[in-house]
């Protein structure tokens, strides 16, 4: 087993292990295509894409596993619950940005106050939109009823 797990770049002082999963080309390709790491995206578009994905999948657990799952209003309550969680996540992103990026006003990258604000607003718009699209799809497709 020791031939599979070894220090990263054969340097034992880095504090990271090189495993077949962490150093594989497929893993690097997959992680490189995630919106947070993709080159050429503005913080607003990064937040929009991440928010759409999160909003889309957040409505399902509230709809299927929520306390009103057997009522006729389960989908609407699931939508409002997803909206509430999106508000909490947006508040958390805002607080993180205010605490982490004090005095870094300039720049359009994600590691500045302006970039993080753009990311947060894109996330909230995308998440509300993604949850709304999921609601419309679940409400209008009879397969899920």
From Swiss-Prot:
Its main location: plastid. The keyword Cell membrane does not apply. It is found in: Plastid, Chloroplast thylakoid membrane. The chain crosses the membrane at residues 48-68, 75-95, 125-145. The lineage of its organism: Eukaryota, Haptista, Haptophyta, Prymnesiophyceae, Isochrysidales. Signal peptide: none annotated. The gene is psaL. Coiled coil: none annotated. Belongs to the PsaL family. InterPro entries: PSI_PsaL, PSI_PsaL_sf, PSI_suXI. It comes from the Eukaryota. It is a multi-pass membrane protein. GO terms for biological process: photosynthesis. This is Photosystem I reaction center subunit XI. GO terms for cellular component: chloroplast thylakoid membrane; photosystem I reaction center. The keyword Chaperone does not apply. Keywords: Chloroplast, Membrane, Photosynthesis, Photosystem I, Plastid, Thylakoid, Transmembrane, Transmembrane helix.
